Structures are given as C-alpha cells and as structure tokens.
UniProtKB/Swiss-Prot annotation:
Motif (Nuclear localization signal): 213-227
Superkingdom field: Eukaryota
Compartments where located: Nucleus
Gene: SLK1
Principal location: nucleus
Family: Belongs to the adn1/SEU family.
Protein name (record): Probable transcriptional regulator SLK1
Pfam (any one): LIM_bind
Region of interest called Disordered, as start-end residue ranges on this chain: 67-93, 138-163, 572-653, 667-712
Taxonomic path: Eukaryota, Viridiplantae, Streptophyta, Embryophyta, Tracheophyta
Length: 748
C-alpha cells in the first residue's frame, strides 16, 4: 500500500511537471524580472515603483507555475505533496526513538495558508489589504501556538528569549536611523544597478534623445557626476587630458586610484543624455557590464555606496568588440538616485571577428604563394621585371587591404569612439563658460561685452580678497616670511585729558627693531593718541614718528612696513569717513628744538606714551600709567639715554611682549639713540604740523647673526653712518602714500 501511494504521487508529479514544464521555465524569467524587480515591459514606461525592490531576483519554477494554475489542480498538487511527506513507517522502523517531537501540520491548514497568500498576491500586490493581513496573522498565531505546545518548557523559554532579543535589536535599529532616512535593505543598490542595465539594453531602435532624457531623470540625481579616469593608461596621449591639459592636473584627481595626473573626463547631469545618445550613435550596438562581488556601504547621512573592485565593460560594435577592465564605484542618494558614477579604467583590448579577417589573410597568402611559385619556376634570373612588378603590386594591395580592415577608424587609442571623446571635451568647455552664459543672459548683453565685464568684476573681486587677506594677516600678528623674518607686535593706545578749552593732539608711532639680511628680528610697533591741553587759544596738531633700530639690506622688511602703514591708512579712512583733511605732513631729518609754548608736563607725557598703549578712558590704562616707574631722562641731542622698562601688567599679550622687550634692553645695558621731535606755533591761527625724526644705525654683517638680545646692542653701538641713513629713510618714507595722505589722522 505504501509503495502504491509513493508511486502514484511520483507519477502524478511527473505528469504535472511535464504538463506545465514549458510554462514554468518561461515564468522563471518573466516573474523574476517583471514581478520582483518591477521593471516595466515597455522601455518608455518608467515609474517610481522601481525604487521598491523585493529580496530575490528569480523565483522557483514550481512556485511560479502554481500561481497560474487553477485552484483544483493546486489542491491536488498539495495533497500529493503532503501524501509524499506523510508516508506511514513500518513496524520495525525505530527512527522515532530519541528524536524531538515533530510538528504535525494538517493539510487543511497548509491549503488555507496557500489560498490566503494567493488571494493577497492577486488582490493587493503591495500587501496592504487589511482583511487579508488579519487572516494571515491569525493563521500565523495558530501555527505558533501549535509549535509552542509541541515544545518542551526549556525550548519554550529559549524561544521567548530569542524573540525578545530580536525585538530589542529591531527597536535599536529603528531608533538609530533618522526619520527622514528610509530603512536599508541589503542588496538594494545592486538590484538598482541591474534595473539600470536592463533599461540601457531595452532602448528604442531609433535611439531618440527623448528616451535618454527620461532615462537619466529616472536613474540620476540632478547633482550627479560621471567620471572616467584614464590615469593608469601608459599610452594615453594629450587627447586624454581634455581641453585644458595644463590646468587639468591641478583641477582633476581620481579618488579610486589616488593619482593626480589629470587624465580623465567629468560629465555633469546636463550632458549625460546627449553623451549616451552619441555613444550609441557612434556604432555601438550594445554595452555589457560584467561585475565582481559587490561591496555595499551605508553612510550616516543616508548615502549608499556600491563598489566593484573588478568590473569589465564590453562595448559591442558591428565588426569588433572592446573589452575594458577597471574599478567601478557608484554612490546612491537616499531615494536611490545615482549621485556619482566613477570608473577607473586600467586597460582595454580590441577584439576583431575571425570570420571577417580570415578572407583578407587568405587573399594575402595566395598572392604570396603565387609570387613564390613564379620565382621557383623561372628562377631568380629568369623572372622578368614586369612579372616581379606585378607580383609586388599584388602583395602590397592585399597587405594594404588587410591593414585598412584592421584599422578601426571610429576609435582612438583609448578604445572609445572619437565622437564620444570629442563631446566630453566640448562639455568641459561649456561647463567652464557656464558663468559667462548666465551673466550675459542676466545682463542681456553680447558675449564679447559680457566677457569684458565679467573679467573686470573677477579682477575686482580678486583684489578685494587679496586686500582682506593682507589685513587679516597683519591683524592676526602673522609672521613675515622671506630673507628677513620679523614678528610684529601691535599695540594701540589712546589717552585723553583736558585742562582748558582747547586740545592738543599728538600722534606718535615708535618703531624699534633690528633687521639685517637673513637675520631674524622683532619689530614692535605701537601707535597711540595722546590728548593734552595748553592755555593757548590755538589748536596745534603734532604728529611725531620716531624710528629706532638698524635696517641693513632689508628691502622686504621695508615693503612689509609700507604695506602695514597702507593697511592702517585704509582702516582709519573706512572708520572715519568725515576726517579732517586740513592737516599737513612734513618729514625732517634734522633735530628740532622743543616748542617754548609746550609745558614740561606735556613733553614728559609724550615721552611716557612712547612705551605705553591702551584704550580711551580705560581703567586698565589708567592703572598702567599709575604703576609705571622709572621715566626716561631728558638728555641733550645726539646723546643716548637709558629707557627703564615699566612694571605694569597689561592684560593683552602685545603689551606683555613690549614690556618684556624693554626689560631685556635695560638688563643687557643696551642703549638706543633717541630723537625727539616737537613742533608748535603761537598765535591765533590753527596749524597742523607733523615733525618726524628717525635715527638708524648699521649692523655690520659678519660673525654670527644678531639675536633678539644682541640686536639692540648692535643697534646702539654702531652709529657710524647716521646722516646717510637719515637721508635714505627720509627718501623712503616721503615716497610712501601713508605719510602723504591726510585722511588717516582725520578721526583721531
């Protein structure tokens, strides 16, 4: 009886397989492509449903065939299958010993579940029918209860723990993913690429640009870029560098191979449709892609990367094929649109069809054999000149014909169609001129006039950026690089006071330092404004600039100082638009005498301000002024005097650096040459005078370069060419626009 049941089931199954075998084979491909991948049968019918891709690509043949069978045949098939599974065992069979309890599933339950699944698939392909989902959920719960009843208590506990752990992991995964990022499915990028290749092959025969524009809009993001790297080609010529071979290495770099040779092309979203259309219009019949094992990664921002370390791209032409091997990397957005397509080609091979080359080779062989037979019959001396000439012409003709056939007219050295590469080069030119096109369209002017205006605006913007960078560089106390390296410490101070109805403004800039050739020095520049008062009714403006130090062969340091002065001029002009332009500037190399109308306290205050800096009405500045001790002594002209370093504790690092330098000068016994400039005028008229004296000393080069400490000593000890340096400094500063501009002192 058992044998009869088994044989009957097998025979019926074989008969059923024979009856629907062809249909099942046909449905494997159609269901795998159309149902699972949801690729439309028509190439023109793109839809957004292609984003949702199920797990598998190919269905089983029996499952695919059962979906299209009548219900009665499905019931018979299920009964036969369950009959095969429930064959009774003989009495002498001991397989039931020491085995786990087996779950006995009734045939009715299996049939009911199968019917429910079929109804769900037919009525609602997306699985959102609530009634069917409720029935299916009840069926699953009943099966789960039956399974729990058949288990032992230990197995039940273990199953419950596994279910709890699975739920916790799922909750953690959903919490980590942002709400705007869709859940990640393994293999979704690879399946999206398969859909891309399918629609690439199922293009219309007329190769219209409308289809390719719709194709690009479906699979590429508006910010997409397609990059082709040819850096690993040894024989790549200049045509692989695009239209800008000199600027290409600095602007183009491959992220896959890490080289910066500039051999490659980049196409944006705007030209992708035209590029694909030209590719297939240049003789390419089909394009195939053979891929290795994929590597998928998901980034925290939702982007997904699909990488193939080994990818083979084959382009099929009418008479030959081009096989190209390389590295492929594709980056997808959150909505599965291609953001970046990068292909780094390593090498390529051009394969010709044997059936097309064989006739040409045979013809050449026949001509060569004929020449050989002619020579062997007549001998080397008996061959006439006419026969020899005819034979040679035949050989040359056959060889040229073969060479012409072997030469691929439409391809270049890289294996790409010449028209395709030319289009890539044109796209780079258009990309570089996109700003000009937009500018001419907005201004409604011609291309030549637009190019002139755009160039002027570009130059203006560059100059403004350069000025801002210079101001930031000097404002941030940056170091000046060159043969003379100087560190600038900037301090600014303002002290206001009044004893009467009139004001007396003094602008003093003191520079101390030592610069000699490649030596490294430090320059301390302090600028301050001191307001005093006299009993006179006249308003006297005194602007004094005192320079101390040694500058020997330091053209770059002088240029840096000039730039800094120009920067101060621009800053004060911007901050004080209503500046007083009535002030006059003057530069004198002689030592003036103090003004008789100026009080000693004012003169002492001027000398005191040479080493102090602060802000207007600042409590810190007042405290510094009270705590200063050891004022400088007034000595006769052309005699050095000793400057005592103040012991005030400034809150800024610039003031601390200045105090430290002065303290080192006093400790090392260094002396500096001091020249004071005072100017004044009595009467009822308002005058603006600016008297500046500068004293410099040369440091003889030789021996070791002066350091920060001994540079001040050298500056004070060597005073050999004092008058010559004064004239040189006078000429340098008189030509500078900083001292000829009256706007800088307007707001002080």
């Amino acid at each position: 009886m058992n044998r009869t049941v088994v044989s009957g089931a097998v025979e019926s199954s074989f008969s059923l397989t024979d009856a629907v075998g062809t249909e099942a084979l046909n449905m494997q491909r159609s269901s795998g492509i159309n149902n699972n991948m949801r690729i439309p049968t028509s190439p023109m019918s793109f839809s957004s449903n292609s984003v949702n891709i199920p797990g598998s690509l190919v269905l089983d043949g029996s499952a695919a065939s059962m979906q299209h069978l009548p219900q009665q045949q499905q019931q018979q098939l299920l009964q036969q299958q369950t009959g095969q599974g429930s064959v009774p065992m003989r009495e002498n069979n001991y397989s039931h010993v020491d085995k786990k309890p087996r779950l006995e599933v009734k045939q009715e339950d299996m049939l009911q579940q199968q019917i429910l699944q079929q109804l769900i698939q037919r009525q609602d392909p997306t699985g959102r029918n609530p009634q069917m989902q409720a029935l299916l959920q009840q069926q699953r719960l009943r099966q789960h209860q039956q399974m729990l009843q058949s288990m032992s208590p230990s197995q039940r506990l273990q199953l419950q723990q596994q279910q709890q752990l699975r739920q916790q992991l799922q909750q953690q995964g959903t919490q980590q993913i942002p709400p705007n990022v869709r859940p990640y499915e393994v293999g979704v990028c690879a399946r999206k690429l398969m859909m891309y290749l399918y629609h690439l092959q199922q293009r219309p025969a007329e190769n219209c640009i409308t289809y390719w524009r719709k194709f690009v809009a479906e699979y590429f993001s508006p910010r997409a870029k397609q990059r082709l790297c040819l850096s690993q080609y040894e024989s790549a010529g200049h045509h692989a560098l695009g239209m800008f071979p000199q600027a290409a290495p600095d602007m183009w770099q491959c992220d896959l191979c890490g080289t910066k040779s500039g051999k490659g092309f980049e196409a944006t979203f705007d030209v992708l449709a035209r590029l694909i259309e030209i590719k297939f219009a240049s003789g390419i019949i089909d394009e195939l892609l053979y891929l290795d094992h994929p590597r998928e990664n998901r980034f925290p921002n939702g982007l997904m990367m699909l990488e193939y370390r080994k990818a083979v791209q084959e382009t099929v032409h009418e008479q030959f094929r081009v096989v190209r091997e390389g590295h492929l990397r594709i980056i997808f957005s959150q909505d599965l649109k291609i953001l970046s397509w990068e292909f780094c080609a390593r090498r390529h091979e051009e394969l010709l069809l044997r059936r097309l080359i064989a006739p040409q080779v045979n013809q050449l062989l026949q001509v060569a054999q004929k020449c050989q037979s002619t020579i062997s019959e007549s001998g080397s001396e008996g061959v006439s000149q006419q026969d020899l000439q005819s034979n040679s012409n035949m050989v040359l003709g056959a060889g040229r014909q073969l060479a012409k056939f072997m030469e691929l007219q439409s391809l270049n050295d890289l294996g790409y169609p010449k028209r395709y590469i030319r289009t890539l080069q044109i796209s780079e030119v258009v990309k570089s001129m996109k700003d000009l096109m937009n500018f001419t369209g907005e201004q409604k002017i011609g291309p030549i006039e637009g190019l002139k205006r755009l160039l002027e605006q570009t130059v203006t913007v560059k100059l403004q950026k350069q000025k801002m960078q210079e101001m930031e560089q000097f404002g941030n106390n940056g170091a000046i690089n060159g043969p003379v390296q100087a560190q600038m410490v900037l301090t600014s101070g303002t002290m206001n006071g009044s004893t009467g109805n009139n004001t007396n403004n003094h602008h003093q800039i003191v520079g101390r330092g030592a610069m000699s050739g490649p030596a490294e020095g430090q320059m301390v520049i302090s600028s301050g404004t001191v307001s005093g008062a006299t009993a006179n009714n006249n308003s006297n403006n005194h602007n004094q600039i005192v320079g101390r130090g040694a500058m020997n062969g330091s053209a770059q340091a002088a240029a840096a100082l000039t730039n800094y002065q120009s920067m101060l001029m621009r800053q004060n002009a911007m901050n004080n638009p209503n500046s007083n332009t009535g002030k006059q500037e003057g530069f004198s190399s002689q030592n003036p005498t103090p003004n008789s109308n100026q009080s000693p306290s004012s003169s002492s205050q001027q000398r005191h301000n040479l080493v102090t800096g602060g802000f207007p009405n600042s409590p810190q500045m007042q405290q510094q002024q009270r705590t200063m001790n050891g004022p400088t002594n007034i000595l006769p002209q052309n005699h050095p005097h000793q400057l005592q370093s103040p012991h005030s504790h400034g809150n800024t690092p610039e003031q601390q650096m200045l105090h430290q330098l002065l303290q080192e000068m006093s400790e090392n016994g260094g002396s500096v040459q001091q020249q004071q400039a005072f100017s004044g005028q009595s009467g009822s008229n308002s005058n603006a005078e600016r008297n500046t004296t500068a004293s410099t000393s040369n440091i003889s080069g030789g021996g070791r370069a002066p350091s920060r400490n001994n540079s001040f000593k050298a500056a004070s000890n060597n005073n050999l060419h004092f008058s010559e340096d004064i004239s040189i400094t006078d000429h340098d500063f008189s030509e500078d626009g900083f001292f000829n501009n009256n706007d800088i002192y307007g707001g002080l």
